[in-house]
Curated annotation (Swiss-Prot):
Record keywords, A-Z: Amino-acid biosynthesis, Cytoplasm, Lyase, Metal-binding, Methionine biosynthesis, Zinc
Binding site for substrate: 91
Name of encoding gene: mde1
Record: residues binding Zn(2+): 108, 110, 194
Protein name: Methylthioribulose-1-phosphate dehydratase
Primary site of residence: cytoplasm
Keyword Cytoplasm: yes
SMART domains: Aldolase_II (SM01007)
Active site annotation, chain numbering: 137 (proton donor/acceptor)
Domain of life the protein comes from: Eukaryota
InterPro entries: Aldolase_II/adducin_N, Aldolase_II/adducin_N_sf, MethylthioRu-1-P_deHdtase_MtnB, Salvage_MtnB_euk
Annotated organism of origin: Pyrenophora tritici-repentis (strain Pt-1C-BFP)
Length: 232
């Protein structure tokens, strides 16, 4: 085995459960049990120093191994490791958009609640509306915004932009970046009839924010069933 091949393999071998290659596998197995990455959908990526670890495309996320990971150099955007029999994630350009704005982890799910909320918003508020909700305790799990101290409060309004879906995942980047510019305090973007992207400063924050948002989205769907408003 060539020296550079050995170095590439070393990038994904560690006994540390918090190592990105191990952590992505653990997270995706949990996300599968939540129904977020069913049928090979969704993905997760972690930025660790100057390296980006990315789950592959088209694989059963609950069965992934650390050796399935792609590793990219953050500065050059060149792959340092590419598993020969797997495809790079189609989400990669979207993950990069989050990392270029300081994120340490980005999660993409195909949550049913996310999909349903995008349909409800379009029906009730119009094609260009964003998702808005307030006076829900779990909103406290969402940061106020990039560069701001603390999290949103109970009386604050959570806003999550919604972008149109495209035939190919990578083609979402332009509209995703536009939404990031328009809503600079948002840590999530919904994709109509598709799912959601959630990012955070680190893995812990991205995971807990994704959990909080999914909980809020489920509540929002149930509130609509009962005729309850999301905002005053």
């Amino acid at each position: 085995m060539a020296s550079n091949d050995i170095d590439a393999e070393a990038l994904v071998h560690s006994d540390d459960p918090s190592h990105p290659a191990n952590h992505i596998c653990t997270l995706c197995a949990k996300f599968y049990n939540l129904g977020w990455v069913t049928g090979t959908g969704g993905g997760t990526s972690i930025r660790h120093e100057d390296k980006i670890y990315i789950a592959p495309s088209g694989v059963q996320k609950e069965l992934m191994k650390p050796t399935d990971m792609f590793v990219m150099d953050f500065n050059s955007k060149e792959y340092l490791r590419k598993p020969q029999v797997l495809k790079p994630s189609a989400c990669t350009p979207l993950f990069l958009a989050a990392f270029e704005r300081g994120a340490g982890c980005c999660i993409h799910t195909h949550s049913q609640w996310a999909v349903l909320v995008t349909l409800i918003v379009e029906r009730d508020f119009g094609k260009d509306a964003c998702f808005e909700i307030e006076e829900i305790e779990q909103i406290k799990g969402i940061p106020k915004g990039r560069g701001k101290q603390g999290n949103l409060g109970y009386y604050d309004r959570l806003r999550i932009p919604i972008i149109e879906n495209t035939a190919h995942e990578e083609d979402l980047r332009e509209s995703l970046e536009e939404a990031m510019e328009k809503y600079p305090d948002s840590y999530a973007i919904l994709v109509k009839r598709h799912g959601i992207y959630v990012w955070g400063d680190n893995v812990h924050k991205a995971k807990t924010q994704c959990e909080s948002i999914d909980y809020i989205l489920q509540l929002a769907v149930e509130m609509k069933k009962l005729g309850l408003p999301w905002t005053k």
